[in-house]
Amino acid sequence: MLNSRSELLDQFLRQQGIRNEAILAAIRELPRERFIPEALSHQAYQNNALPIGEGQTISQPYIVAKMTELLELTPTSNVLEVGTGSGYQTAVLAKLVEHVNSIERIKSLQWNAKRLLKQLDIYNVSTKHGDGWKGWESKGPFDAIIVTAAAESIPNDLLFQLKDNGHLVIPVGEESQQLLRIIRQGEEFFSEVIEEVRFVPLVAGELA
């Protein structure tokens, strides 16, 4: 049953234009039901965002795949994730690169994600309880930064923690949100709008 559900999801993602085989394989291999409340496990392989507690959600699989694809990762990419949440996006990234750095402002979510990743034998992740707006300077600079909550504006600290030719993928806006990809070239930053999205807000400075 799990195989058929993950295969249906794989087929859906391909229909939506996801082409990166490594990303598709990572999503096929990961048991998404482990990252959500047990009562919602019947929805694990549907293309839905689902609540995970603390007012937060796990993103729909299409958005996870799309944002990951936009990062243009290589196995040696130095990656920062802002918003660990359930740990699902973290786990997808960990299947693709040698090491992932992930920040979460809500301590209980960070702790639960860290424990779950270990249970799934995913050890190439460093997690931190902290303010994602500030990034993680000591681990940078980064080839890729992915933000899993919507910022009112683009945090400058994240921009300047990108390497030259580094990619930042971030939802921006309040009521209406756009998924942006920003690429650093020297001291300049080039932005493109990918699509309309809906995310929980990225809260600055306030740890929980």
From Swiss-Prot:
GO molecular function: protein-L-isoaspartate (D-aspartate) O-methyltransferase activity
Reaction(s) this enzyme catalyzes, per UniProt: [protein]-L-isoaspartate + S-adenosyl-L-methionine = [protein]-L-isoaspartate alpha-methyl ester + S-adenosyl-L-homocysteine
Broad class of where this protein is predominantly found: cytoplasm
Superkingdom as given in the UniProt entry: Bacteria
GO CC list: cytoplasm
Keywords: Cytoplasm, Methyltransferase, S-adenosyl-L-methionine, Transferase
Known EC number: 2.1.1.77
Active-site residues annotated for this sequence: 59
Stretches that traverse the bilayer: none
Subcellular compartments: Cytoplasm
A GO BP annotation: methylation
Disulfide bonds: none
Gene3D superfamilies in the record: Vaccinia Virus protein VP39
Enzyme class, spelled out: transferase
Summary of the function given for this chain in its UniProt record: Catalyzes the methyl esterification of L-isoaspartyl residues in peptides and proteins that result from spontaneous decomposition of normal L-aspartyl and L-asparaginyl residues. It plays a role in the repair and/or degradation of damaged proteins.
PANTHER family from the UniProt entry: PROTEIN-L-ISOASPARTATE O-METHYLTRANSFERASE, PROTEIN-L-ISOASPARTATE(D-ASPARTATE) O-METHYLTRANSFERASE
Record family assignment: Belongs to the methyltransferase superfamily. L-isoaspartyl/D-aspartyl protein methyltransferase family.
Name of protein: Protein-L-isoaspartate O-methyltransferase
Organism, as annotated: Aliivibrio fischeri (strain MJ11)
